[in-house]
Curated annotation (Swiss-Prot):
Gene transcribed to yield this protein: dbp2
GO CC field: cytoplasm; nucleus
Keywords (A to Z) from UniProt: ATP-binding, Cytoplasm, Helicase, Hydrolase, Nonsense-mediated mRNA decay, Nucleotide-binding, Nucleus, Ribosome biogenesis, RNA-binding, rRNA processing
Annotated Gly residues bias: 24-39, 513-529
UniProt-listed Pfam families: DEAD, Helicase_C
Composition bias, Basic and acidic residues: 10-23
Domain Helicase C-terminal: 353-500
Family matches, as Gene3D superfamilies: P-loop containing nucleotide triphosphate hydrolases
Name of the featured protein: ATP-dependent RNA helicase dbp2
Function (record text): ATP-dependent RNA helicase involved nonsense-mediated mRNA decay and ribosome biogenesis through rRNA processing.
Organism, scientific name: Neosartorya fischeri (strain ATCC 1020 / DSM 3700 / CBS 544.65 / FGSC A1164 / JCM 1740 / NRRL 181 / WB 181)
Entry text on domains: The Q motif is unique to and characteristic of the DEAD box family of RNA helicases and controls ATP binding and hydrolysis.
């Protein structure tokens, strides 16, 4: 028997399962679990080793080696997932007060018996070990998504949450996950995780891990982050030792499952974070294969910034009798705290206009600017150009090694390099609270990505500015963009309005203007070690910042 902080003893498990709980009566399981069939053994054969994807499209073949699971719910060990007990203050509110609170915070709820929102942390009914950590982080009150999302997730129901990026949704599912874990049997050797969180990018996965690590400390909850682009060894070690929480990108998780490095038979709390983005990136087949390996009576929480038909279909297929909360408009809309400036330009004007904006933005040394490009090549070329012109810019995209990406993100977060150039794939995982400006050097492929990009600024109640270069090549998107700008009461460039009237075809051939040449492949050394050419380019003599 070994003691773990937080006022309870962690029992070694004999023939019966013991609850991890015991902090605060409300969440203790107390039923005991018969050791009988258990979770152990058995799983090994469930995961074939799969012969890889030789000669075919690797992405489409991912998961081909996973065996179909036949779930007999009668023989599976029972588990606890309903923990919510309504606070007397919440119960005492009239229906009218509840409706007024929801209206004030732009909440729309759907589904059967949706619990009422909570207005402060104490009303959520979290155990003290969770509450004290929340308060230690300095949060004053729950965000809108947390007010409604916590009672929903703690109730054990399947949940859909739609809210803008930066709304606090990570804690909305992380804190109930900790409560859920503490009510489950301890892991036995060979057991997989209890909580699985799927995310679209490495950066977002790491950000989620940071959050859950803070709040899981007092319960000694172990977690690991499983994503591509780094060696598998440390991830395999973590999984083999046993973790209660696995945060993963779909591709690398399937690799681990096919190789028999872990299994999902113990997963009873599944989170799909940024579901819309995962589908945009083509992960739907992998998500479906992963979910097929998880017991069907699990609790599933799906979080998304938008609610397109593809995400609705995923919810219909994998969630049971779900309840839904939407913060803000159900239509595609931008954060109203962001000032949106759209300039109709030609490709060859972009460079000079970018410099003019940066000169103004960087007058305030506390500002941070995130620049989005359409391709990795353009990201590198712009970064090289800016550095040679004396601007402290660094780039981040999918081709860069994880070590370099982490270094770039840290340089940006700390303000050492206040200009970061990124592609869409990197954008969703970037969680930097104090980005003041977003500059869309290239307009994205769709309006959802535009919303996500500009949502990197104006987070946590702050104001932000988004500057967008729009060319005739983008004219097919003009109507959607004008709709977004109009809804947010933004000024509209007359040339953009004109495009809506005459749109239908794209513009000219839309080359990259002065950026047409191929970037060099030089190695070079940056301050953080050996990095790719653009980030290693020396800063020009005429320092601009």
């Amino acid at each position: 028997m070994s003691s773990y902080g937080g006022g309870y003893q962690r029992e070694s498990r004999g023939d019966s399962y013991r609850s991890r709980g015991g902090h605060d009566g409300g969440y203790q399981n107390g039923n005991g679990y018969s050791g009988g069939g258990g979770y152990g053994g058995g799983y090994g054969n469930g995961y074939g080793r799969g012969g890889g994807a030789a000669g075919g499209d690797r992405m489409s073949n991912l998961g081909a080696g996973l065996k179909k699971q036949d779930w007999d719910l009668d023989t599976l060990p029972k588990f606890e997932k309903s923990f919510y007990k309504e606070h007397p203050d919440v119960a005492a509110r009239s229906e009218r007060e509840v409706e007024e609170f929801r209206k004030k915070h732009e909440m729309t709820v759907q589904g059967r018996n949706v619990p009422r929102p909570v207005e402060n942390f104490d009303e959520a009914g979290f155990p003290q070990y969770v509450l004290s950590e929340v308060k230690a982080q300095g949060f004053e009150r729950p965000t809108a998504i947390q007010s409604q999302g916590w009672p929903m997730a703690l109730s054990g129901r399947d949940v859909v949450g739609i809210a803008e990026t930066g709304s606090g949704k990570t804690l909305t599912y992380c804190l109930p996950a900790i409560v859920h874990i503490n009510a489950q049997p301890l892991l036995a050797p060979g057991d997989g995780p209890i909580v699985l969180i799927l995310a679209p990018t490495r950066e977002l996965a790491v950000q989620i891990q940071t959050e859950i690590s803070k709040f899981g400390k007092s319960s000694r909850i172990r977690n690991t982050c499983v994503y591509g682009g780094v060696p598998k060894g440390p991830q395999i070690r973590d999984l083999s030792r046993g973790v209660e929480v696995c945060i993963a990108t779909p591709g690398r998780l399937i690799d681990m499952l096919e190789a028999g490095r872990t299994n999902l038979r113990r997963v009873t709390y599944l989170v799909l974070d940024e579901a819309d983005r995962m589908l945009d990136m083509g992960f739907e087949p992998q998500i479906r294969k992963i979910i097929s390996q998880i017991r069907p009576d699990r609790q599933t929480c799906m979080w998304s910034a938008t609610w397109p038909k593809e995400v609705r279909q995923l919810a219909t297929d994998f969630l049971n009798d779900y309840i839904q909360v939407n913060i803000g408009s159900m239509d595609l809309s931008a954060n109203h705290r962001i000032t949106q400036i759209v300039e109709v330009v030609s490709d060859f004007e972009k460079r000079d206009k970018m410099i003019k904006h940066l000169e103004k933005i960087m007058e305030n040394r506390g500002n941070k600017c995130l620049i989005f490009t359409g391709t990795k090549r353009i990201a590198d070329e712009i970064t090289r150009f800016l550095r040679q012109d004396g601007w402290p810019a660094l780039s981040i995209h999918g081709d860069k090694q994880q070590q370099e990406r982490d270094w770039v993100l840290n340089e940006f977060k700390t303000g050492k390099s206040p200009i970061m150039v990124a592609t869409d794939v990197a954008s969703r995982g970037i969680d930097v609270r104090d980005i003041t400006h977003v500059l869309n050097y290239d307009y994205p492929n769709n309006s959802e990505d535009y919303i996500h990009r500009i949502g990197r600024t104006g987070r946590a109640g702050a104001k932000g500015t988004a500057i967008t270069f729009f060319t005739t090549e983008n004219s097919k998107q003009a109507r959607d963009l004008v709709t977004i700008l109009t809804e947010a009461k933004q000024q509209i460039d007359p040339r953009l309005a004109e495009m809506v009237r005459y749109s239908g075809g794209g513009g000219g051939h839309g080359g990259y203007g002065r950026w047409g040449g191929r970037g060099g492949r030089g190695g070079g050394r940056g301050r953080g070690g050996s990095y790719t050419a653009s980030n290693a380019a020396p800063l020009g003599n005429a320092r601009r910042w």
